[in-house]
Amino acid sequence: EVLSFIEESVQGDLAFFDNSEGELIHVGIMLEDHHIIHAYGKVRIDSIDHTGIFNREEKRYTHQLRMIKKMV
């Protein structure tokens, strides 16, 4: 089931990210409190919102959110 809003996600749901051509290029596992665990050079826990993954160290979005699928 594809979720309409990030607020509907729970820990364990999968978030998918695309590039500017619309190709899926990245996936992560949703955690609590709008965080995600994913591998981007190394395994990371970052913030996520309706735009995508925000890297606080780089102060920029690194991945554009395409959809979140309910897994649990």
Segments predicted by a language model, with ranges:
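Aromatic- and glycine-rich peptidoglycan recognition patches
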Residues: L3, L31-V72
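Structural motif
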Residues: G12-L14, H34
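A generic structural signal for residues embedded in beta-strands
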Residues: F16-F17, H38
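Short beta-strand or tight-loop elements
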Residues: V10-Q11, Q64
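Catalytic nucleophile-His microenvironment captured as a short glycine-rich beta-strand/loop
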Residues: L24-E32
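Short gly/pro-enriched beta-turn/loop segments at secondary-structure junctions
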Residues: S9-V10, E23
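Catalytic cysteine-centered active-site loop
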Residues: E1-S9
